[in-house]
C-alpha cells in the first residue's frame, strides 16, 4: 500500500458531489462491461436524475488532490442501510481507498443509528470481497430481485 497523500472526505460541495457522481457513472460502466449486462434493473436511470437525493451520505477519496474513489450509504429499510457503488479508479488503486471508504461508511451508519449495513457485490471482485470479509460482513440471503447469478449479498451488524 502506498503512502501517497490520501484524503477521504464527506462530499458536500456541488463540486465534490459532481465528482462522486462521475465516479459512480464510471463504476456502472465498469460493472456493466465486466458483467456484460446492464444494471438498469437497479433503477439507476432514476437514481442519477435525482442524484444525490437517495443517499444519506457520499464519500470521496482523493489521491494527491485528484478524485480517485467514492462510495455512498443509502437507507434500505428501518434500521438497515446499504453500502452502494464503492469504486476506485485504476489510477487510485493501491492506496487502501476501498477499505478507508468502507470504514468511513460504517462509522457514519453507526452514528446515524443503523443496526445493519447491507451490500451486494460480484463474487469475482476478489479485492472487494476480501475487504468486506475482513471488516466482518457475512453472507446473507438475497435481499432484492437481481437477475444476475454471480451476486453475493452480505451484511454487517453495527
Where are the regions that the model predicts?
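C-terminal "cap" of GNAT-fold acetyltransferases
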Residues: 115-118, 122-135, 141-158
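Conserved glycine-rich acetyl-CoA-binding loop
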Residues: 66, 80-81, 85, 89-103, ...
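Acetyl-CoA-dependent GNAT
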Residues: 6, 10-84, 89-90, 102-104, ...
Amino acid at each position: 500500500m502506498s503512502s501517497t497523500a490520501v484524503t477521504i472526505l464527506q462530499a458536500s460541495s456541488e463540486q465534490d458531489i459532481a465528482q462522486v457522481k462521475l465516479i459512480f457513472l464510471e463504476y456502472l460502466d465498469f460493472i456493466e462491461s465486466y458483467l456484460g449486462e446492464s444494471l438498469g434493473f437497479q433503477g439507476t436511470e432514476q437514481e442519477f436524475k435525482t442524484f444525490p437525493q437517495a443517499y444519506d451520505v457520499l464519500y470521496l477519496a482523493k489521491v494527491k488532490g485528484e478524485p480517485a474513489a467514492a462510495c455512498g450509504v443509502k437507507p434500505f429499510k428501518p434500521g438497515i442501510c446499504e453500502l452502494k457503488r464503492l469504486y476506485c479508479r485504476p489510477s487510485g488503486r493501491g492506496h487502501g481507498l476501498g477499505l478507508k471508504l468502507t470504514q468511513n461508511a460504517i462509522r457514519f451508519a453507526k452514528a446515524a443509528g443503523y443496526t445493519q449495513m447491507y451490500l451486494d457485490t460480484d463474487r469475482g471482485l476478489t479485492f472487494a470481497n476480501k475487504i468486506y470479509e475482513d471488516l466482518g460482513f457475512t453472507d446473507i440471503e438475497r435481499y432484492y430481485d437481481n437477475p444476475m447469478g454471480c451476486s453475493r449479498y452480505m451484511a454487517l451488524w453495527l
